């Protein structure tokens, strides 16, 4: 039936055009300029090192946390680096020999308040999935553990708290994942850190050791789209981590910063942009 087939092609083509239009809109919309800086990034990093700041990382065993720890040590931005987790991690590389490890029971965090004392900057990369931990377990990790850790960090003197959240986070969302992410963002903000930075990455482009079929499928589907529209629906994990570190040295005067996926790309690629200019 030519007419039916033609209608199918027309509908399929229309859907494809709509997807491309939406993607292009997301690619082009929103701020894309680099932050205005009185100094170049390398100078800002040198100035930051002179401050002898200390930091802690929550979730250093996860993909973002592992990459973050690696880049922090390579950059030598902090004079002291502590990872806080439920178990001690084994490192073979000599570069990790000075990393401090605080092993805590997240169900009894009040008993481990000392682990959160004396840090200038905190990075929270804690997270699990409903598929892995169940609904209650997901809420406990992504909300309860994160919020309690932030409370202890604030009490311990942390000035700048960085939270890895998710694209689409919204405390009013009907989707559990996005609602919980939005709720914890709002509740951590209420703690009143001197500086609170929220990172909302889209799909992270990374090959996880942990099996997450839905993320694997999403990465495969998004790979060609990411090539054409790199900032719309995904972000390489290395770019996210570089954005976290670049954000720290930029010393923004904003108390609360919300960085969506496109802003993460911009911040994470500052070195490349400086080299081109």
Task: Please place each PLM-identified region on the residue numbering.
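Flexible, glycine-rich beta-alpha linker
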Residues: 172-173, 194-231
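N-terminal membrane-anchoring alpha-helices
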Residues: 1-47
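Conserved Rossmann-fold NAD(P)-dependent oxidoreductase catalytic core, especially the SDR/UDP-sugar
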Residues: 87, 132-190, 194-199
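N-terminal Rossmann NAD(P)H-binding glycine-rich loop of SDR-like oxidoreductase domains
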Residues: 40-77
């Amino acid at each position: 039936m030519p007419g039916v087939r033609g209608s199918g092609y027309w509908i399929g083509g229309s859907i494809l055009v709509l997807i491309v239009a939406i993607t292009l809109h997301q690619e082009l919309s929103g701020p894309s300029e680099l932050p205005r800086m009185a100094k170049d990034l390398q100078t800002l990093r040198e100035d930051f090192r002179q401050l002898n700041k200390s930091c802690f990382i929550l979730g250093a065993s996860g993909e973002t946390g592992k990459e973050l720890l690696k880049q922090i040590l390579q950059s030598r931005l902090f004079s002291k680096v502590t990872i806080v987790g439920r178990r001690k991690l084994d490192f073979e590389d000599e570069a990790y020999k000075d990393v401090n490890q605080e092993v805590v029971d997240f169900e009894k965090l009040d008993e481990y308040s000392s682990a959160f004392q004396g840090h200038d900057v905190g990075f929270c990369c804690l997270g699990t999935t409903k598929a892995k931990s169940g609904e209650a377990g997901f809420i406990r990790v992504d909300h309860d553990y994160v919020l309690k850790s932030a409370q202890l960090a604030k009490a311990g003197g942390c000035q700048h708290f960085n939270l890895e959240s998710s694209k689409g986070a919204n405390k009013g969302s009907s989707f559990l994942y996005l609602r919980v992410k939005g709720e914890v963002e709002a509740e951590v903000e209420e703690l009143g850190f001197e500086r609170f930075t929220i990172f909302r990455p889209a799909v992270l482009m990374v090959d996880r050791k942990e099996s997450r079929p839905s993320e694997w499928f999403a990465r495969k589907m998004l790979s060609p789209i990411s090539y054409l529209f790199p900032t719309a629906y995904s972000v390489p994990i290395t770019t996210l981590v570089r954005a976290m570190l670049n954000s720290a040295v930029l010393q923004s005067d904003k108390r609360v910063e919300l960085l969506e996926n496109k802003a993460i790309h911009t911040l994470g690629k500052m070195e490349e942009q400086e080299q081109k200019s």
